[in-house]
Amino acid sequence: SERPKRVFNIYWNVPTFMCHQYGLYFDEVTNFNIKHNSKDDFQGDKISIFYDPGEFPALLPLKEGNYKIRNGGVPQEGNITIHLQRFIENLDKTYPNRNFNGIGVIDFERWRPIFRQNWGNMMIHKKFSIDLVRNEHPFWDKKMIELEASKRFEKYARLFMEETLKLAKKTRKQADWGYYGYPYCFNMSPNNLVPDCDATAMLENDKMSWLFNNQNVLLPSVYIRHELTPDQRVGLVQGRVKEAVRISNNLKHSPKVLSYWWYVYQDDTNTFLTETDVKKTFQEIAINGGDGIIIWGSSSDVNSLSKCKRLREYLLTVLGPITVNVTETVN
């Protein structure tokens, strides 16, 4: 099915309100065809991101490899009632407007609902889940234990993510909701230095229609790394946008695809993207069927006067003019 033709929108999701204390304002953002929360609020009318909201079960790292168990530590041990209650409290406190009709982003990155995908600093949730089953069934073989752990984890991970999304939609009906980063692609990773997504991940994305069916917007992340060649940077964006568009095309309601994009290199956060990298990555998002871009920034990008000045200068001279060009060309 062909996706509906939509206006290509670019959003400002940068905590530039932190620059107000230095007498620096970012009122020009809107001049560049960028949707900008009124008063430069970080949680605002156009876009609101909620970091680790509620009380998702998680193992929170402490020093020396220890961790704190939050709400059972893993989804199959968690109390969903407590989580959902806290989730609504968080939303009401952070952005109380129940008529919110912008983009609502749930940013939860402690674990992923596909058991296999919990590697790196998420691996701890896998290990914890396996240990739980092993303690219960000490005589089972390794494979059986892992299978059971995976089954339990995925069942309840789905429950937590799905119910959270449904509740967000129920209490903020007019907003477009989605989880940051999904669908994942795992392209341009050390083991997969190609534009195409990891084949297994694509199959797993197909199994996650329960999530994407409930999202009005898909929010793949296309932050790029300096260590990649310029062509690889473009390839990273291409693969991730294509996969999100593929998922959207397979859904009846064809959710919008808005790519999360950061103006610095992920592995070199003191360096702004070159003009060429900005142009090429923006074009790549548009060419591959994306419906827009969310320009993201970290609080540590704007925590001093000099950083605020640099970002403002970059917006006025590099980023702004390119966003105008891209939005006008595409629309």
Swiss-Prot record:
Keyword Metal-binding assigned: no
Record's subcellular location: Secreted
Pfam families: Glyco_hydro_56 (PF01630)
The protein's enzyme class: hydrolase
Tissue specificity comment: Expressed by the venom gland.
One GO cellular component, as annotated: extracellular region
GO biological process: carbohydrate metabolic process; defense response; hyaluronan catabolic process
Bridged cysteine pairs (disulfide): 19-308, 185-197
Keyword 4Fe-4S found: no
Main location: secreted
UniProt GO MF annotations: hyalurononglucosaminidase activity
Record key words, sorted: Allergen, Disulfide bond, Glycoprotein, Glycosidase, Hydrolase, Secreted
InterPro entries, sorted: Aldolase_TIM, Glycoside_hydrolase_SF, Hyaluronidase, Venom_Hyaluronidase
The enzyme's E.C. designation: 3.2.1.35
Gene3D superfamilies: Aldolase class I
Glycan attachment points: 79, 325
Catalyzed reactions per annotation: Random hydrolysis of (1->4)-linkages between N-acetyl-beta-D-glucosamine and D-glucuronate residues in hyaluronate
Active site: 109
Stated role: Hydrolyzes high molecular weight hyaluronic acid to produce small oligosaccharides.
Family: Belongs to the glycosyl hydrolase 56 family.
The name this protein goes by in its record: Hyaluronidase
Species in which this protein is naturally found: Dolichovespula maculata
The organism's taxonomic lineage, starting at the top: Eukaryota, Metazoa, Ecdysozoa, Arthropoda, Hexapoda
